[in-house]
Amino acid sequence: MNAIIFCLLFTTVTATYEVFGKGIEHRNEHLIINQLDIIPVESTPTPNRASRVQKRLCGRRLILFMLATCGECDTDSSEDLSHICCIKQCDVQDIIRVCCPNSFRK
């Protein structure tokens, strides 16, 4: 009789531990996952496409930029401004060098 009670008690304790023990481990894993969700990940923001692409001047934009910089383009140079600014990246100094070098002497 004592052996039967001992076996039942042992089985009950073992089964209870198995059920609740796995539940506690499972809850702990979820707590860790939830804490990871709360902690913000610090990373550098990804730049948008417009800021990654090199600024090139082609066509109408090139003409407007040239007119704003030099007025008329008086060139004696054999350099092609559209090749410099549309294929490569150019700046104000390139436009001054090709279109109006005499107007902006240093």
Swiss-Prot record:
Q: Provide the GO MF annotations for this entry.
A: hormone activity
Which keywords does UniProt give here? Cleavage on pair of basic residues, Disulfide bond, Secreted, Signal
Q: What is its main location?
A: secreted
Q: Does the keyword DNA-binding apply?
A: no
GO CC entries: extracellular region
Q: Which Pfam families match?
A: Ins_beta
Domain of life assignment: Eukaryota
Task: List locations, semicolon-separated.
Answer: Secreted
Residue ranges the record assigns to the propeptide: 16-56
**PROSITE patterns assigned to the protein according to its UniProt record, in alphabetical order:** INSULIN (PS00262)
Q: Which residues form the signal peptide?
A: 1-15
The Gene Ontology biological process terms listed for this entry are:
negative regulation of dauer entry
Q: List the disulfide bonds.
A: 58-86, 70-99, 73-100, 85-90
UniProt lists the family membership as follows:
Belongs to the insulin family.
Supply the name of the protein.
Probable insulin-like peptide beta-type 2
Q: Which organism is it from?
A: Caenorhabditis elegans
Q: Which gene encodes it?
A: ins-2
